[in-house]
Amino acid sequence: MGKKQIMIPPIIVGIATLSGFVIMHFFPAPSPIEVCLRSHNDTFNVHSRIDLEIDGQKKLMSDNVGKSKDGRECLRVIHTDKIGDQVHVQFVRPVRLTLDDFMKIYSADNSTIQVVDNSTGSNLYQNITLADYNVDYSYFSEDRFVKISNLTSSPPLSDTFLAKITLVSK
């Protein structure tokens, strides 16, 4: 074999690798929170708790959080499986998602959230306009709730994660 024949395979591999890096740089994969899941049985599953409190009253998340995107049916990476305080993080691989990512799904329009009031024994769905409230976020750590000043710096959602979203009327 000549030198040219020996050099051809490494050159082809080098060009293919460089092409892959260029494609990934200019066309990155979408953020996990933008993805619609194909099924409800992916390998990475985390269940976190998020307590909602509005003017001192405990509220629950509805069972349709993370079930649609842009008005069409879509199972999002962060969603609720039933009415309550538990969110389900599900993906094909381990992923680090925070309370900020949850709020991008829970309040897609960044102005309203839907809550459930079951204080009377029956579920009453309410749409809450966030602009009417002072909103505080915190997470439970070392026997107390720690205020989150910047949602992007919150700890990742995990099976032991407990957050509190407190809304107080302005």
Positions of the model-derived regions?
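Ubiquitin-like/PB1-type beta-grasp interaction modules and other compact soluble beta-rich domains
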Residues: G2-K170
